[in-house]
C-alpha cells in the first residue's frame, strides 16, 4: 500500500479573497515524489504555512499562463535558489507559459544555481517522474477547453504486484536480498531458478489516478481524458444559473463538474477554482448543486488536506 497526500494551497479563481487565494495544489506520495499543480500568487507563503519547503518540489505543472495560475512561479524559483537548491526542477506547461517563465528569469538576471528542465506540452503527452521504486508515478496531460491554450493533468500511480508471504512459504522461499532485485527488475535468480513478481503475488498491477482540469469549459476531449480517474479536481467557477457566463469565459459550473465526475467513473469530486463572488457560506450553493448529480462531492477550501491510502 501507499499514501497520497493532497493539500489545497489556494482554491480561488482570478480575483483572490482573504479566504480563497489563487489556485495551487500540492500532491505528495509515499515514494517521496512532490508535484505542485499551478502556482498562483503567494504560493510560497502557502507552502510555508503547511510546513513544506519549496525545495522539496520535484515537478511544477502549470495549466496555462493566466496570472492566477502562474504569477507565483518567479518568486518560488527565487526562493528555491536562496535555499541553495541543487537538484533539477521539471516544469511542464504550454509554450506560452514556458516563454513567460524564461523571460521573467532573464529580466531579473537570476542565476538560480540549479537546472530547470522545461517540458513543452504542445499536445497530449506523458512524463515519467523518476524515483527508483517498483511503484511508478507518471503525469499525463491533454489540452483543456479554455479561452487560451491550457492543459488538464492526470497523476497516475502504477503499483507493482505485492508479494504474498503465504505464497513464499508455499514455494519454500525465504526473504532475502533477492527481493530488492525482484521489485526493481520484476524478476530475480533465487536458488537456481528465475522467480517473477507474478509468481509470488496474489494480485496483479494496480493503477490509481488524480485528475486536475485546470480552467476548462465542458468538452468531449476533456471528458474523455478524465475517464477512469479516481479523484477529480474540477473547475467549478460558477453555479449553473451562470452557465452562459462560465462558457463564454472558458470555465465550468459546479453542475458541469458533477456531470464529468459521473461519466468519468470518479470516486470523489473536489470542486475547485471558486469565484470570489461566492463569499463564505454562499459557496455551499456550488456544493448543493453538484451533490444532486454526484453525491460524493466536497467543496475545496484553502488549507484543505486529503490523505488516501491505496
From Swiss-Prot:
It comes from the Archaea. Zn(2+) 1 binds at residues 64, 66, 146, 215. Gene3D superfamilies: Ribonuclease Z/Hydroxyacylglutathione hydrolase-like. It holds the Pfam family Lactamase_B. Keywords: Endonuclease, Hydrolase, Metal-binding, Nuclease, tRNA processing, Zinc. It catalyses: Endonucleolytic cleavage of RNA, removing extra 3' nucleotides from tRNA precursor, generating 3' termini of tRNAs. A 3'-hydroxy group is left at the tRNA terminus and a 5'-phosphoryl group is left at the trailer molecule. Its cofactor is Zn(2+). Transmembrane segments: none annotated. InterPro entries: Metallo-B-lactamas, RibonucZ/Hydroxyglut_hydro, RNase_Z/BN. Zinc phosphodiesterase, which displays some tRNA 3'-processing endonuclease activity. Probably involved in tRNA maturation, by removing a 3'-trailer from precursor tRNA. Belongs to the RNase Z family. Homodimer. HAMAP family: RNase_Z_BN. This is Ribonuclease Z. It comes from Aeropyrum pernix (strain ATCC 700893 / DSM 11879 / JCM 9820 / NBRC 100138 / K1). The gene is rnz.
